[in-house]
């Protein structure tokens, strides 16, 4: 979905479809959640606010971290994502997405972070990830819909996980929650001024209330715990 090259392994497309967004960008993003039973209400709201039509997706995502040794334990987030197929073979094309540390701008109404996306082909992705020094933190599957409003992307999805690592049959996949995750974002050139886009994203998010309260989630505070004061 994000800066992906749409590659058809079955050979049914005549040419590749390439997203024109540069691979290295900055991203403004907000997160929210809604009970799964209320998703139809959200979809009706989005149908009235967004561009015509939406796109369904079913994806497998793994989150890896790369920790640097030193005085502080710095954690770098790497996301691996691929289309998830239940009836056909799983694709070996992955989106490799680096997510940078959010900007420490308390006045900005959204999360702002650097991201780098690229496409990787591998029949043994775990071996490739380990060769990069990455360690998997968790994995999950997402199934939902993508909407757009100009350059704003809106995703809502149900998250599921497998009870046995590496096994993805219907008996092993279980729902994570009775709620759906909602994410809205804007991608900008790496050096662009982000505040106008962030305010525009916040204004759009406010139109989803009271169905969804989109928030600037301080997830990085858990990623980077405060250091203990040195002993004297």
Curated annotation (Swiss-Prot):
Pfam families: Med18 (PF09637)
Entry annotated with the keyword Nucleus: yes
Any GO molecular function: transcription coregulator activity
Assigned keywords, A-Z: Activator, Developmental protein, Nucleus, Transcription, Transcription regulation
Compartments where located: Nucleus
InterPro entries to which the protein is assigned, alphabetical: Mediator_Med18
PANTHER family: MEDIATOR OF RNA POLYMERASE II TRANSCRIPTION SUBUNIT 18 (PTHR13321:SF2), MEDIATOR OF RNA POLYMERASE II TRANSCRIPTION, SUBUNIT 18 (PTHR13321)
Record function comment: Component of the Mediator complex, a coactivator involved in the regulated transcription of nearly all RNA polymerase II-dependent genes. Mediator functions as a bridge to convey information from gene-specific regulatory proteins to the basal RNA polymerase II transcription machinery. Mediator is recruited to promoters by direct interactions with regulatory proteins and serves as a scaffold for the assembly of a functional preinitiation complex with RNA polymerase II and the general transcription factors.
Subunit description: Component of the Mediator complex.
UniProt protein name: Mediator of RNA polymerase II transcription subunit 18
Lineage, uppermost ranks: Eukaryota, Metazoa, Ecdysozoa, Nematoda, Chromadorea
């Amino acid at each position: 979905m994000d800066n992906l090259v749409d590659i058809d392994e079955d050979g049914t497309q005549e040419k590749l479809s390439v997203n024109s967004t540069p691979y290295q960008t900055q991203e403004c993003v907000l997160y929210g959640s809604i009970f799964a039973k209320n998703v139809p209400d959200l979809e009706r709201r989005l149908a009235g606010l967004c561009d015509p039509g939406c796109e369904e997706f079913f994806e497998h995502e793994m989150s890896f971290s790369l920790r640097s040794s030193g005085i502080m334990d710095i954690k770098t987030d790497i996301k691996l994502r691929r289309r998830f197929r239940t009836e056909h073979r799983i694709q070996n094309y992955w989106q490799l997405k680096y997510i940078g540390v959010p900007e420490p701008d308390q006045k900005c109404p959204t999360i702002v972070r650097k991201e780098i996306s690229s496409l990787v082909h591998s029949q043994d992705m775990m071996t490739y990830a380990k060769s990069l020094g990455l360690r998997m933190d968790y994995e999950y599957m997402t199934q939902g819909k993508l909407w757009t409003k100009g350059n704003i992307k809106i995703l809502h999805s149900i998250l599921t996980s497998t009870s046995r690592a590496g096994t993805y049959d219907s008996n092993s996949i279980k729902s994570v929650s009775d709620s759906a995750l909602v994410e809205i974002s804007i991608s900008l050139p790496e050096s662009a001024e982000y505040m106008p886009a962030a305010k525009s994203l916040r204004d759009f998010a406010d139109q989803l209330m009271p169905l969804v309260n989109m928030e600037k989630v301080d997830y990085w505070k858990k990623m980077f715990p405060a250091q203990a004061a040195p002993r004297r």
